[in-house]
UniProtKB/Swiss-Prot annotation:
Annotated PANTHER family: MAJOR FACILITATOR SUPERFAMILY, PROTEIN HOL1
An example molecular function term from Gene Ontology annotations: transmembrane transporter activity
Membrane topology, from the record: Multi-pass membrane protein
Intracellular or extracellular location(s): Cytoplasm, Cell cortex; Membrane
This protein's record includes keyword Cell wall biogenesis/degradation: no
Domain of life: Eukaryota
Descriptive protein name: Uncharacterized MFS-type transporter C1271.10c
Location, primary (coarse class): cytoplasm
Record-annotated membrane-spanning stretches: 61-81, 100-120, 125-145, 187-207, 214-234, 340-360, 382-402, 426-446, 458-478, 486-506, 522-542
InterPro entries according to UniProt: MFS, MFS_dom, MFS_trans_sf
Organism per entry: Schizosaccharomyces pombe (strain 972 / ATCC 24843)
Pfam families xref list: MFS_1
SUPFAM superfamilies xref list: MFS general substrate transporter
Length: 581
């Protein structure tokens, strides 16, 4: 271990409490919130998003959740119009299934294609482009006349949801500290759940009262309002924190001595007296060092200027390293991002979130088929109301995985000498590992045997609980494990997740037809248990896997940072190794 709070060069293992003997020094330079060491360490620049006041941070989160809710709703409302579209336009149900598959593909792979633009041109432009596609897709849906139209508009709507699949989590990580992210990701998952489950409910009422085309018109109106809010109130969060910290220095007039934040020994002069003390917990080569600055006079504090409102909401915020229009950098980043699929934590998180999308295809299909026939004889509105138990369960799951998850990881860190391990969060997967499969069993078996609606609705609530917390916990774990590549990691999760959704969109109906409802839900309940149970190997071996991939992780970051460099004939002196976003 190293002094001044640097635990070891292992991603996902961080010092979170100052009681740790290497950070408890009175003169420690680590910034804290009470006893909690802030991770990542913010700069002193008030323009750093980590230093924003609570209102700016919370409004940023509100907009992130709003775009997740809106895009989730318009991506799931087409099913409420299927019967009327079939009767009026003759569009087959198979064509509508194809449209749903196209939507999943566009969500996952446009997330991948948009990722480099986030670094090169800023976050705002990606959000705005996606919302624009949502507006166009909704309008196209309202004007559908042919089968090709019905597929094309879903492609546009899929592109719109891409911003809510990876960029939203990245935005959370830019504004909130690591010990705050679990609950924030939980709120994001809850917003996605509200859109996913209540979007079809609202669309069903719109279709029955105003006609199915008004689903598209209302989607256009709500997406348009969201677009305007983002255009004028969503601030750009591009900030080169590493460069800002490197620039910070204190001038000591007596000796003209510069003391850098990293307290590099070669910069220390006679006015700084080292007090070296051997620690039993350290190797012979490692020492605990407390530096006492006798006198710092006439210190020159840096002057920070706040960007104007119009600069903070600029349509494009080009990276400092942008060369020309950035085409070469864009292509190189696309290829670089493919490396994320070599990280086990990315595959694990993608599996958890993708499985939830897969089960969604099954129970939505069952609701629309079995529950609209005898003995239930539900209508469109009654089927839509079946999503209410899911949203209740998802709300509880998000509170469990988010708020309680953050509390649990801090509690575990206190018991570990102030050291927080990423895998501590995965202990919370025990509950969904039990509850989620039980929910699938209750709903599937209850539907097949025509149980009273009560137990089957409870089953839907259990399924919603799994939806709410499995994705929250696994994605928060991934963000903790590899904090330097949050966006790229979430892109990987999105690709895996939506590939699952695409495959099971076509597989679920054949599965149900061949096995029957009861046996199908028994089989996917077992699969659900197996998928979530992969959390236990991650708990036991996750740290070992992080050690195994640590070199690969830092190589990934170094290569990415080199991609940020301008072409050789442009001067980048002093910027080597600093990521410019």
């Amino acid at each position: 271990m190293e002094p001044d709070g640097y635990v070891e060069e292992l991603p996902g293992t961080i010092l979170i409490y100052k009681e740790n003997q290497y950070a408890a020094s009175e003169h420690s330079v680590l910034k804290k919130d009470g006893d909690i060491v802030l991770q990542p360490q913010p700069s002193d620049d008030p323009n750093d998003p980590l230093n924003w006041n609570k209102f700016r941070k919370n409004w940023h989160l509100v907009l992130i959740c709003l775009v997740s809710l809106v895009t989730g709703a318009i991506a799931n409302d087409a099913g409420s119009a299927q019967d009327q579209m079939n009767a009026e336009l003759g569009i087959s149900y198979d064509a509508m299934d194809n449209a749903a598959g196209v939507l999943f593909i566009c969500v996952g792979y446009f997330t991948y294609l948009a990722m480099p633009a986030t670094f090169l041109y800023g976050r705002r432009c990606v959000y705005l482009v996606c919302l624009l596609f949502g507006m166009l897709g909704s309008m196209w849906f309202a004007l559908v006349k042919t089968t090709s139209n019905s597929i094309g508009n879903q492609a546009f709507i899929g592109i719109s949801e891409a911003c809510a699949e990876a960029l939203t989590q990245f935005s959370v990580s830019e504004v909130f500290f690591e010990h705050e992210r679990g609950i924030k990701i939980g709120i994001y998952i809850l917003s996605t759940s509200v859109g996913t489950y209540l979007g079809p409910l609202a669309a069903g009422y719109i279709a029955s009262s105003q006609g199915w085309r008004w689903i598209g018109w209302w989607g256009l109106i709500i997406s348009g309002i969201t677009f305007v809010l983002f255009l004028f109130t969503f601030e750009e969060t591009t900030f080169d924190r590493a460069a800002a910290i490197d620039r910070k220095q204190i001038q000591i007039s007596n000796d003209q001595l510069t003391v850098k934040e990293d307290f590099d020994l070669k910069d220390m002069q006679s006015d700084i007296k080292p007090d070296v003390e051997k620690s039993d917990a350290m190797d012979d080569s490692k020492m605990k060092v407390d530096y006492t600055v006798n006198e710092i006079s006439n210190a020159v504090q840096p002057i920070y200027s706040k960007p104007s409102y119009w600069k903070r909401i600029a349509l494009i915020t080009p990276a400092n390293s942008l060369s020309g229009i950035g085409f070469r950098q864009y292509i190189m980043r696309l290829f670089q991002t493919l490396r994320i699929f070599l990280f086990p934590a990315v595959l694990y998180s993608g599996l958890q979130w993708g499985a939830q999308d897969a089960w969604l295809s099954f129970y939505l299909t069952t609701e629309e088929e079995d529950w609209m026939e005898a003995p239930y004889n539900y209508g469109d509105n009654a089927v839509a109301i079946m999503n209410v138990p899911c949203i209740i369960g998802a709300t509880i799951g998000c509170i469990y995985g988010g708020y309680f998850g953050d509390y649990f990881t801090l509690w575990a860190a206190k018991r570990n000498n102030g050291i927080k391990e990423a895998e501590s969060r995965l202990w919370l997967m025990i509950l969904p590992c039990i509850i989620n499969p039980i929910g699938l069993f209750m709903f599937g078996i209850g539907t097949a045997r025509h149980w009273h609606w009560g137990p089957t609705y409870v089953g839907l609530g259990f399924i919603g609980f799994g939806w709410g917390c499995a994705g929250d916990i696994s994605m928060a774990y991934l963000m903790d494990a590899y904090p330097g590549m949050v966006l790229e990691a979430m892109v990987g999760v999105s690709v895996i997740n939506n590939t699952f959704g695409y495959v099971f969109t076509f597989a679920c109906q054949s599965w149900i037809d061949s096995l029957g409802t009861e046996r199908t839900y028994i089989s996917i309940g077992v699969l659900c248990f197996i998928f979530i149970a992969t959390s236990f190997p991650m708990i036991l071996c996750g740290k070992r896997l992080r050690k195994w991939t640590a070199k690969q992780y830092y190589t990934f970051l170094n290569v990415r940072n080199r991609l940020d460099e301008k072409i050789p004939d442009q001067d980048r002196r002093g910027q080597d190794g600093v990521e410019s976003r």
